């Protein structure tokens, strides 16, 4: 009996990545292992104010993920994540869970997405304790006081750190 060819698993991991953190990078690394192809998608919300413009966030993501052969970076706007996942042919949506409130929100979104397209599976990952509290808003909040550079450096990838230094010069 012949083995059936395995359908390629492709994931989409979306966020604002403003800025990209080591927590995001952990998620991307796991996604690159789980899926044959992973699209890291910067979602653009026209009602949200960003620290870095879209093009800069895309550049930082590309620089930080260039060592992954199966990871691509893109952006989308004015559409739901599930619609974007359908558009690019993703079989899975990858989401990170850091807290109970993250879980409650993501569970609700998973249920809604399942109603819209049950063929796209949502995968939840929980980051290790050492980076579970790291968020873009936390990083933004650390920037400014004397010595911020030393503290922030451990929470962001090198390309992001260099841009932060440049933007604060």
Task: Report each predicted region and the residues it spans.
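Nucleotidyltransferase catalytic core that binds NTPs
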Residues: 1-169
């Amino acid at each position: 009996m012949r083995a059936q060819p395995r359908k390629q698993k492709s994931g989409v991991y979306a966020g604002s990545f403003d800025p990209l953190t080591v927590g995001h990078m952990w998620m991307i690394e796991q996604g690159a292992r789980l899926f044959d192809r992973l699209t890291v998608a910067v979602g653009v919300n026209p009602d949200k104010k960003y620290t870095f413009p879209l093009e800069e966030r895309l550049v930082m993501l590309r620089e930080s993920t260039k060592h992954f052969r199966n990871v691509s970076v893109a952006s989308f706007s004015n559409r739901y994540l599930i619609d974007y996942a359908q558009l690019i042919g993703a079989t899975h949506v990858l989401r990170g869970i850091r807290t109970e409130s993250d879980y409650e929100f993501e569970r609700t979104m998973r249920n809604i997405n399942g109603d819209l397209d049950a063929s796209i599976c949502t995968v939840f990952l929980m980051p290790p304790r050492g980076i579970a509290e790291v968020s873009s808003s936390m990083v933004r909040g650390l920037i400014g006081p004397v010595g911020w550079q030393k503290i922030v450096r451990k929470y962001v990838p090198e390309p992001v750190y260099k841009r932060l230094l440049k933007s604060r010069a």
